[in-house]
Regions:
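N-terminal "domain-start" segment
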Residues: 1-91
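Glycine-centered secondary-structure boundary/capping sites
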Residues: 10-14, 35, 98, 119-123, ...
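Surface-exposed, low-hydrophobicity interaction/linker segments
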Residues: 65-124
Protein backbone atom coordinates (compact mmCIF):
# COMPACT_ATOMS: atom_id res chain seq x y z
CA UNK A 1 0.00 0.00 0.00
CA UNK A 2 1.61 3.24 -1.18
CA UNK A 3 -0.13 5.42 1.41
CA UNK A 4 1.17 3.24 4.26
CA UNK A 5 4.68 3.38 2.79
CA UNK A 6 4.47 7.17 2.49
CA UNK A 7 3.36 7.37 6.14
CA UNK A 8 6.32 5.18 7.12
CA UNK A 9 8.66 7.44 5.14
CA UNK A 10 7.36 10.51 7.00
CA UNK A 11 7.90 8.74 10.32
CA UNK A 12 11.44 7.58 9.45
CA UNK A 13 12.39 11.11 8.36
CA UNK A 14 11.24 12.33 11.80
CA UNK A 15 8.88 14.73 10.03
CA UNK A 16 6.85 15.43 13.21
CA UNK A 17 9.98 16.95 14.75
CA UNK A 18 10.08 19.70 12.12
CA UNK A 19 6.67 20.06 10.47
CA UNK A 20 3.34 21.05 12.05
CA UNK A 21 0.68 18.33 12.20
CA UNK A 22 -1.66 20.20 9.84
CA UNK A 23 1.03 20.23 7.12
CA UNK A 24 1.76 16.54 7.63
CA UNK A 25 -1.96 15.90 7.12
CA UNK A 26 -1.86 18.14 4.03
CA UNK A 27 1.10 16.33 2.42
CA UNK A 28 -0.53 12.95 3.09
CA UNK A 29 -3.69 14.19 1.37
CA UNK A 30 -1.71 15.56 -1.58
CA UNK A 31 0.19 12.30 -1.92
CA UNK A 32 -3.11 10.37 -2.09
CA UNK A 33 -4.36 12.74 -4.81
CA UNK A 34 -1.07 12.40 -6.66
CA UNK A 35 -1.73 8.68 -6.99
CA UNK A 36 -5.45 9.03 -7.82
CA UNK A 37 -5.80 12.13 -9.97
CA UNK A 38 -2.77 14.19 -10.99
CA UNK A 39 -4.89 17.13 -12.17
CA UNK A 40 -6.76 17.25 -8.84
CA UNK A 41 -3.40 17.13 -7.04
CA UNK A 42 -2.22 20.05 -9.19
CA UNK A 43 -5.35 22.07 -8.32
CA UNK A 44 -4.85 21.44 -4.60
CA UNK A 45 -1.16 22.36 -4.76
CA UNK A 46 -2.08 25.63 -6.49
CA UNK A 47 -4.74 26.31 -3.84
CA UNK A 48 -2.21 25.64 -1.05
CA UNK A 49 0.30 27.97 -2.72
CA UNK A 50 2.84 25.21 -3.39
CA UNK A 51 2.99 25.86 -7.14
CA UNK A 52 1.88 28.53 -9.60
CA UNK A 53 -0.87 27.99 -12.16
CA UNK A 54 1.47 28.43 -15.12
CA UNK A 55 4.06 25.87 -13.97
CA UNK A 56 4.60 22.74 -16.04
CA UNK A 57 3.30 19.90 -13.93
CA UNK A 58 3.86 16.17 -14.15
CA UNK A 59 4.19 13.35 -11.62
CA UNK A 60 7.95 13.81 -11.15
CA UNK A 61 7.57 17.54 -10.56
CA UNK A 62 4.71 16.93 -8.11
CA UNK A 63 6.81 14.50 -6.08
CA UNK A 64 9.74 16.91 -5.96
CA UNK A 65 7.43 19.74 -4.87
CA UNK A 66 5.96 17.59 -2.08
CA UNK A 67 9.49 16.96 -0.79
CA UNK A 68 10.53 20.58 -1.21
CA UNK A 69 7.40 22.08 0.30
CA UNK A 70 6.51 19.65 3.07
CA UNK A 71 9.56 17.72 4.24
CA UNK A 72 12.42 19.18 6.26
CA UNK A 73 14.55 19.60 3.15
CA UNK A 74 17.64 21.77 2.74
CA UNK A 75 17.37 23.68 -0.55
CA UNK A 76 20.14 25.58 -2.27
CA UNK A 77 21.72 26.00 -5.67
CA UNK A 78 24.89 24.26 -6.80
CA UNK A 79 27.12 26.92 -5.21
CA UNK A 80 25.88 26.01 -1.70
CA UNK A 81 25.71 28.71 0.95
CA UNK A 82 27.75 27.01 3.67
CA UNK A 83 26.55 29.38 6.41
CA UNK A 84 22.96 28.46 5.57
CA UNK A 85 23.80 24.74 5.31
CA UNK A 86 25.61 24.80 8.66
CA UNK A 87 22.64 26.54 10.30
CA UNK A 88 20.18 24.01 8.84
CA UNK A 89 22.29 21.02 9.86
CA UNK A 90 23.00 22.40 13.34
CA UNK A 91 19.25 22.69 13.94
CA UNK A 92 18.47 19.27 12.48
CA UNK A 93 21.28 17.52 14.36
CA UNK A 94 20.55 19.51 17.54
CA UNK A 95 24.27 20.23 17.87
CA UNK A 96 26.72 22.66 16.35
CA UNK A 97 27.78 21.58 12.88
CA UNK A 98 30.22 23.36 10.65
CA UNK A 99 31.69 22.52 7.28
CA UNK A 100 33.53 24.89 4.98
CA UNK A 101 33.81 25.10 1.23
CA UNK A 102 37.44 24.02 1.56
CA UNK A 103 36.35 20.83 3.34
CA UNK A 104 33.36 20.03 1.13
CA UNK A 105 34.32 21.47 -2.26
CA UNK A 106 30.64 21.19 -3.29
CA UNK A 107 30.79 17.38 -2.95
CA UNK A 108 27.73 15.83 -1.31
CA UNK A 109 29.71 12.76 -0.18
CA UNK A 110 32.09 14.91 1.86
CA UNK A 111 29.23 16.73 3.59
CA UNK A 112 27.42 13.44 4.25
CA UNK A 113 30.57 11.83 5.63
CA UNK A 114 31.14 14.68 8.09
CA UNK A 115 27.51 14.53 9.29
CA UNK A 116 27.85 10.76 9.83
CA UNK A 117 31.20 11.13 11.62
CA UNK A 118 29.86 13.76 14.03
CA UNK A 119 26.34 12.44 14.71
CA UNK A 120 23.87 9.55 14.57
CA UNK A 121 22.42 11.07 11.40
CA UNK A 122 23.12 10.94 7.70
CA UNK A 123 22.08 12.89 4.63
CA UNK A 124 19.99 11.76 1.70
CA UNK A 125 20.37 13.48 -1.66
CA UNK A 126 17.24 14.69 -3.40
CA UNK A 127 17.67 14.56 -7.18
CA UNK A 128 16.10 17.73 -8.55
CA UNK A 129 16.92 16.94 -12.17
CA UNK A 130 18.91 20.18 -12.41
CA UNK A 131 21.82 21.79 -10.61
CA UNK A 132 20.08 22.54 -7.31
CA UNK A 133 21.35 21.04 -4.06
CA UNK A 134 18.59 19.51 -1.93
CA UNK A 135 19.08 17.07 0.94
CA UNK A 136 17.19 15.46 3.80
CA UNK A 137 18.51 14.55 7.25
CA UNK A 138 17.63 11.16 8.70
CA UNK A 139 18.85 8.79 11.41
CA UNK A 140 21.60 6.49 10.12
CA UNK A 141 19.51 3.53 11.27
CA UNK A 142 16.64 4.55 8.94
CA UNK A 143 18.66 5.26 5.77
CA UNK A 144 18.34 1.83 4.13
CA UNK A 145 14.59 1.61 4.71
CA UNK A 146 14.02 5.19 3.51
CA UNK A 147 15.88 4.41 0.27
CA UNK A 148 13.84 1.21 -0.18
CA UNK A 149 10.58 3.13 0.28
CA UNK A 150 11.73 5.94 -2.01
CA UNK A 151 12.55 3.37 -4.70
CA UNK A 152 9.14 1.69 -4.37
CA UNK A 153 7.32 5.06 -4.46
CA UNK A 154 9.58 6.36 -7.22
CA UNK A 155 10.64 9.39 -5.17
CA UNK A 156 13.89 11.20 -6.11
CA UNK A 157 15.70 10.37 -2.84
CA UNK A 158 19.14 8.73 -3.03
CA UNK A 159 22.23 7.98 -0.95
Amino acid sequence: NQDALFDELLMLLETKKYIKAKYIKQVKSLYKWLNKDLEKCREKMIAFGDIYEDEDFDEEYAKLELIRSYLHCYQDDWKIDYDSLNHFLSEALEQTFEITFEEAQHEFARIKNKVETESDYTLLYVDTGCDNFYCLVCPKSAETRIIEIADILNLPINH
